[in-house]
């Protein structure tokens, strides 16, 4: 019986080692890297100027349902979305960025000029040419 317990203990010890091996860290695509750089260097006063370095389609669309904002194309995005960003002096801290297929997701800590802080998530859908086509700010 002691031998059986020893063998079972030995078997359990080695079979309970980590089954998940560390995956090598995947490098971000050029578009995801551009978004990451934009988020990490974000200044509300230069928001659209910095954002314009990220590749987008001509008629890319953004919606921020919690604050009632929606815009299509660079001119509307600059006026509506970045108008809000400038008005609120919105600060963004990138917590994490994840890329999966044609989606890039940013997890953010946001702070307004009044000191209000909240968590946010932005999901970017990228087309087959690596250009941002849709953005959901949640």
Predicted features and spans:
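Short, low-complexity N-terminal intrinsically disordered segments enriched in polar/charged residues
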Residues: 16-46, 50
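Hydrophobic alpha-helical core bundles mediating ligand binding, dimerization, or RNAP-core interactions
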Residues: 35-38, 42-45, 55-56, 81, ...
């Amino acid at each position: 019986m002691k031998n059986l317990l020893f063998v079972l203990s030995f078997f359990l010890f080695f079979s309970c080692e980590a089954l998940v091996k560390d995956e090598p860290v995947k490098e971000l695509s050029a578009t995801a890297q551009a978004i990451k750089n934009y988020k990490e260097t974000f200044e509300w006063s230069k928001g659209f100027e910095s954002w314009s370095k990220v590749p987008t389609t001509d008629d890319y669309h953004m919606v921020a349902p919690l604050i009632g904002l929606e815009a299509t194309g660079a001119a509307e995005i600059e006026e509506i979305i970045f108008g809000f960003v400038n008005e609120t002096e919105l600060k963004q801290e990138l917590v994490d960025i994840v890329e999966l297929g044609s989606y890039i997701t940013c997890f953010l800590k946001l702070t307004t000029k009044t000191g209000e802080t909240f968590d946010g998530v932005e999901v970017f859908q990228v087309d087959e040419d690596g250009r941002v086509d849709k953005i959901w700010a949640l």
